[in-house]
From Swiss-Prot:
ABC efflux transporter that is able to transport rhodamine 6G (R-6G), a known substrate for many ABC transporters, but seems not to transport azoles. The keyword Transmembrane applies. This is ABC multidrug transporter H. It is found in: Cell membrane. It comes from Aspergillus fumigatus (strain ATCC MYA-4609 / CBS 101355 / FGSC A1100 / Af293) (Neosartorya fumigata). The gene is abcH. Residues 1-49, 760-782 are annotated as: Disordered. Residues 23-42 have a biased composition (Polar residues). It is a multi-pass membrane protein.
Amino acid sequence: MEDQGHLPSEPRALFDRRDDTDSTNTALDETDLSRTPLQDTSHTPHAEDWSLMPDLKKQHDRNVASGFRRRELGVTWKNLSVDVVSADAAINENVLSQFNIPQHIRESRNKAPLRTILHESHGCVKPGEMLLVLGRPGSGCTTLLRMLSNHRLGYKAIRGDVRFGSLTPEEASKYRGQIVMNTEEELFFPTLTVAQTLDFATRLKVPFNLPDGVTSPEAFRQETREFLLKSMGISHTSDTKVGNEYVRGVSGGERKRVSIIECLATRGSVFCWDNSTRGLDASTALEWAKAVRAMTDVFGLSSIVTLYQAGNGIYDLFDKVLVLDEGKQIYYGPMSQARPFMEEQGFVCREGSNVADFLTGVTVPTERKIRPGYENRFPRNADELLAAYEKSPIRAQMAIEYDYPDTESTRERTEEFKLGVLDEKAKRLSKNSPFTVDFLQQVKACIIRQYQIIWTDKATFAIKQISTVIQALVAGSLFYNAPDNSGGLFIKSGALFFSLLYNSLLAMSEVTDSFSGRPVLIKHKYFAFFHPAAFCIAQIAADIPVLLFQISMFAVVVYFMVGLTTSAGAFFSYWIIIFVATMVMTALFRAIGALFSTFDGASKVSGFLISALIMYCGYLEPYHAMHPWFIWIYWINPLAYAFDALLSIEFHNKIIPCVGNNLVPFGPGYDDTTFQSCAGVGGAVRGMTYVTGDQYLASLTYSYSHVWRNFGILWAWWALFVAVTIIATSRWKSAAEAGNSLLIPRETVAKHHAVVRKDEEAQLNEKAGHKGTGTDSEAQSNVDQHLVRNTSVFTWKNLTYTVKTPSGDRVLLDNVYGWVKPGMLGALMGSSGAGKTTLLDVLAQRKTDGTIRGSIMVDGRPLPVSFQRSAGYCEQLDVHEPFATVREALEFSALLRQPRHIPREEKLKYVDVIIDLLELHDLEHTLIGRVGAGLSVEQRKRVTIGVELVSKPSILIFLDEPTSGLDGQSAFNTVRFLRKLADVGQAVLVTIHQPSAQLFAEFDTLLLLAKGGKMVYFGDIGDNAQTVKDYFARYGAPCPANVNPAEHMIDVVSGHLSQGRDWNQVWLESPEHSSASRELDSIISEAASKPPGTVDDGYEFAMPLWEQTKIVTQRMSTSLYRNCDYIMNKIALHIGSALFNGFSFWMIGDSVADMQLKLFTIFNFIFVAPGVINQLQPLFIERRDIYDAREKKSKMYSWVAFVTALIVSEFPYLCVCAVLYFVCWYYTVGFPSDSDKAGAIFFIMLCYEFLYTGIGQFIAAYAPNATFAALTNPLILGTLVSFCGVLVPYAQIQAFWRYWIYWLNPFNYLMGSMLVFSVFDTDVKCKEGEFAVFDTPNGTTCADYLSTYLQGVGSRANLVNPEATSGCRVCQYRYGSDYLYTINLKDYYYGWRDTAIVCIFVLSSYALVYALMKLRTKASKKAE
């Protein structure tokens, strides 16, 4: 069985280096791999211990035999300084402060303060060397790594010299795939499996020249992938999704290893590893370090590593160490001399401490220990240490290396590197291309991945196809069997318009989709996997079959149900035009997504754009009615060209007889066509009772000759949008490049500055040598006074957890048992993927699927109803509301989770205690933000711990890897605090990955798990871990002296020391197991016989629902108030759409055509919804995911409070939006200025704001992700728009729909109420072309001839010349009410009736948000 913990490097075939010159250059012991002059020759790397070292050497030998060159590149830097804009300058404006123009002008005059985050750093890493960069978070380690991996964007100023071999940074940028950085974050497409993720990486790095014995690129790729998976110990995860915070996948440690593999797959020459052991267990972390050492030795790599918690085993593998503090380089030199140097300055390294922690702690007053006699002369801060280092002989000797880039051997090696890279490249690539495989292979790889992404997110794919079929059937039945006469003109035009509209709305989801995988694509850009054009072409290639299927289903259903021209030529012309138009709209929205760095900006533009394109496509407003100031939009509108082509295909060479209201007069007694004429039909000629299709098209400025011209224009638009997407994609940059800084809300700036000044004064006191012991002791007693005492015993017995997988049931926990008593600090350990997080999830009642068997009890009794909120659980992933400050997040948790009988003031006072304890006072008034813009990973981890601690957990505290991502001092402080909690009676259970010996000694008991969730040990740890050591020694695995027992244990149960033994079986047969089982039974029975230690208050939530709602609504409202992008985009979309709508329908008149325009301007108001909904839903889903991931599971507040807060927090902005739209639109279109009518219409518009928000929220409430929601919107909105009586008037809607869906459609009542108030009292005045003009028989007067008509079917018509005997002029309507009657609005009271019904629909839409949220909310699994 493959050892899980092994993390070998790549096979050497992965690092092909052609050598056409001298084979001696490739020898492992060559002299030019020599270390620094100060290298301690007694230091022997432990890479030889690595189990896969022989395989690595075989690969190396194969490369030598194949004649591969060595690609070696050292890194040298001198006087390197980096400046950024000070964090204090990064102010997060709120909705009101952004309009404070005078303040912005004043601030713009002040030059933004700069902060030096890296100060005159220097160093040299030659091929074959490893450098360890140490420093506390914020000291500049990551910045240095970014400089040394040539990631230079996002900084205000960079000074100094960096050379890669003899290359300058500009020259090295052509080789970005060879100088790579593995960042701290794991960025993947979560729905792809591990194998699919690695397939993609390896496929794009296959060299052109293959090693001897490898038959094909595919064989090389397969060999690479299988070796990497196997060597990293995660072969068993190959078919498991990678996952993320919200998608279940591999464990956190396994995900980190996938990240490492992907980085190794680049086959680079310079590797920068940024805290790459975060989330790995101690044994796996050590194996990874050995792998890097082996790679570096065998292949001459340059490896630069920064680690926060480096055990001595890892530390000893490095050649050099560089220590940073406050950006200053306080040590750089040989690893072996770092500790002696610091000890010479007067610092003492405690016994059992990690040397790395000792080096980073020398400037921390609470961490350092001073040698007797040095109390008054040791360096107290970074400046003094830097001065001491500058005077040391180490500094002078290391400076010798800085000429390395200019040496002849380096220049030769760099030329060799260039040739080696060139040998690997596909021959069709240009010399300066950073890529490895040719463009076609890049496209192929991207296409495969694109189909995998589509297929692994089946729900999104299915909703797109299902909604298309449903919408096609609905639309086909709505426009069913449209007649071939004048009555069918409007219906057929509506059907053709809807064909474009629906597919365009569906394409809007591309904006949402554009942002979902962007961080992954940016990472791959730095890895030089593919050109952005390859990705864009792959998206198109994936689009084509999906869209062909989608459009074919839609076209077949709609075309033949509507009864459009039944000829093959006409059908396929319709089909191809719809397909091309959809391709164009997809490309357009994808380009918009690519052009913007934020989703809010893209959604604002796309929402406004869809309104503009729909309005100016020629359907709502014909070309001749468009105003000159906006008519240019028609000519740049792809939908206009498509609509022109569709109408021309349908009506060309048709004879269209006028019928019904379009024929004047008609009815009994009017059968002679000589004395009839068409009315209200475009292109009608006086005295004619029909119009030809081409006449009708000409009246719209369309022509059949335009069809294929427009087809070509549509493809030209498509090509333009694709080109824009490619250019925009190539300019994407990561969030960190924009400058990673703290964000301070405008309203807390003064508070933050006060805290900063206080900190600066404290630092000055420290530099002056003052000590604050009195204050520290006071704070200490204050903390002790507030800590919670607990008396409950928590037990679990025979716990088994099973989940269903495609290959059958999989056991993740196998008969696990244990307990945590008051005052006990328990450690839960095991290799990555052993089931530690799963066990905590099950114990904390956080699982919503799978099967749990066994018992979980408190005081020998079933878990109380309040358990989930009474037990604190710090999860591994830090999920927080990004627009909350640190203090607000802690107060929110304290107010909602501490018992209801505790006064509010006391809860908030406890928050101050935790802020001091976790040293968060300098961050308390800053926004949490997102990674890259806000708190760092380490700071977020402290906030996560704080959020749980402020809740005063009364039963126990679970912490899942609370020290991952923290530096050694922060990790020790965290565990020391947990120790303190335990000492006052709290029960604490912690999963921990890489504890130092010091850290491990703080724990009382250990539960050790092996692969498959099997128990390996449970019991006391003992002084200096002696009890655990004795147990393993007894079974043949003694812990050597000076080896961290925590690392040793993991190595024994899952690493190369396992000796193939089943340690679970060893445990089950041991006396310790029997003793622990008996003690567990005794604890349960004893606890059950006593009164419970914790009295259950019987409440599921700590606070009443009303209090929950108030607190959560306040947080949501504050969050929206600070989310300027979201609010301003909503406001800008309303103002822009309103002005656009108003000026497009400027001062509408009172003619028959103007009645239609009034209908259409109101109809266009509806289309403000898609843009706002598309922007609203991702925010709703992000909030819901935060709630689902953490707040729901800890019973912080009810889902009812959550939904209420989300709904209510939007209200103020919806009111503002309604006012703005009304003011910008109502008077510009010339609607009645009477206050009663204007007020009524404003009220309806306000109701509509609430209505569409409710619709968007109920879709989002149940949607699994934002893309799914964006694809569902067209189905819902398309149906509502179709049946509101505009596209097809009420009288012509098919009977099946007319009698139910029409009456259940809120848009119907919205349109009806607004039309009644704006049109009912209008006097209709026909324009010249709108009159039906005809002669009378036998010289009778017009009044006499039309008397029967005017008293019957034409009673609403207006005869303007009754006494005339020829040229009778009849207008279709007298008043607006006559027009409204034809669309089923028969009386004025309909306006108020419909208004009331709209209000009812508003309430019902919000009720659906509650219903669907409840339907989606799963209960936690209980043990069976």
